[in-house]
Amino acid sequence: MYGSFFFYVLQYEAGKVRRHSIMTDDAKILETVIAEFEALTRIPRPSGHERAVSDYLKKRFAEIGCTVTQDEALNIIADLPAAEGCESAPRTILQGHMDMVCVAEPGVIYDSLSDPIKLQRTEEFLTADGTSLGGDDGIGVAEILTAMQYTEAHGPIRAIVTVDEEQGMTGARHLDAAHLKDARFLINCDSEDYHIMTVGSAGSVNLDFSRMLTRRESNLPAYRIAVAGLLGGHSGERIGDGRGNAIRTLALALQSLEKHGKIELVSFTGGTARNAIPPTAEAIIRTEVGEREIVGVLAGEEKRFRSIYGAADPAMKFAFGAAEHTGRVIGAAEQHALISLLTLLRTGVHDMSHLHADKVETSANLGVLRMDDSEVQVQYFPRSSVNERLDEIIAAAQTMAELTGFSLVVGTQSPAWREREESTLAKIMGEVYSAQNGGAQMTVESIHAGLETSWHAAKNPALDMVSIGVTAHGIHTPEERIEIAAIVPEAKLMMETLRRIAHEKK
């Protein structure tokens, strides 16, 4: 399958792998990466169903001269010996994941468990025919395989390809720390912009509040109040934009209405996912407060909202009207506890990074509010690049739960990957990028979202890590596409970085 794309003759001598390059021009690097990627697209590999692709990678890494371990989780750990003369160099890990998000355009018949991806190639892009492409992270794994074949001078290299990154990071979580502790550097290949080097990411934790409800009848007039027009967005990517949170906005409005007369809550819902800023929320109330007075209170709340969030969320508005179909109201103490909790929980940015003034360090998102006849549930999702900040938020949440009579379930904490103030690997890679791009500087950033590197950092805090990747667009959608022009530069960036590391001391 690969014969037309192999440009090295591998010779084995005393446990060493020696490479004799026949041709190493850019075109052949490109075709090798695409060939490796195309082989992956033929194997169905949705998260949780990685046996076939794991078995394939076990065989493939062995074919290029690696000693391969397949662990119980189906992670692949593949060790390539140092090139001759580079045995004293530190070990570098090249890391990616083998699973993908499988989605299809409406009307496209596609079984993610049995159908291969139909790879398409134009002059500019790699795409798929009607489905997601799986470039996240298939192209990263292909780059790893190519770099391990082409780099002539290198220290010991270990490829780690994990399972289930897209759903639960269970591969990274269950990876034996021994595979990380004998390495000095780790290059994660799961980013989506060749020009950006990521050097830190946020940890997070699921905080789930709940409280049982009692119900009673009420004869007061019933109304519907809703918040609409907010932009919402991903709570990692957009939390720093200063956007409003519909659930908290409506809770504050109900709190203001309580000052004008009796309010009885029938229902209160909002949000769709804990990691999404909720753009809408809705409540059904019964109240003795007159309609004109309610309209006035809501107008005041709109004014207050715009003074805080108007620049980022200019289209916010309240919708108000009579409610035709209502149920029984919840108890007064339960209503007070719920509104208190929703207004006490701090949403949005908590702290900015001390290393990068324009980057968020710590935030929290009040993502989902659900209510049925017998229970109310609140999903709260803090993130931070500093683990101790998450600990503080958890402690505060536990106190709020105690004060308001809510139960709190604290999920497994995803650790932060905290940016190093001095990174040898980032310095080397930045210099290589600049030399290969006419003196241009690589963008260096920490992201306010989770990466597998967070789990690696927790298991070996001494690991010097970066995350890079081939430029891609529309990941996790049928519009996903990979920029072909970025494939070779990415490979050469990795290869030259490995060559320079070969001259580092352990």
Where are these regions (language model features)?
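A short beta-alpha structural unit
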Residues: 38, 42, 271-273, 283-284, ...
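Acidic-enriched catalytic cores of C-N bond-cleaving enzymes acting on peptides and small amides
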Residues: 216-220, 239-269, 288-363, 397-399
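Active-site-adjacent substrate-binding region
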Residues: 245-268, 419-463
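Active-site metal-coordination/substrate-binding segment of hydrolases
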Residues: 86-184, 219-222, 335, 343-353, ...
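Acidic/His- and Gly-rich active-site-bordering loop/insert found
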Residues: 22-125
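His/Asp/Glu-rich mid-to-C-terminal helical/loop segments that flank catalytic regions of hydrolases
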Residues: 178, 243-260, 289-290, 336-343, ...
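Zn-dependent metallopeptidase/amidohydrolase metal-coordination segment
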Residues: 33, 354, 361-377, 381, ...
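Fold-level recognition of mixed alpha/beta catalytic cores in primary-metabolism enzymes, strongest
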Residues: 155-246, 254, 258
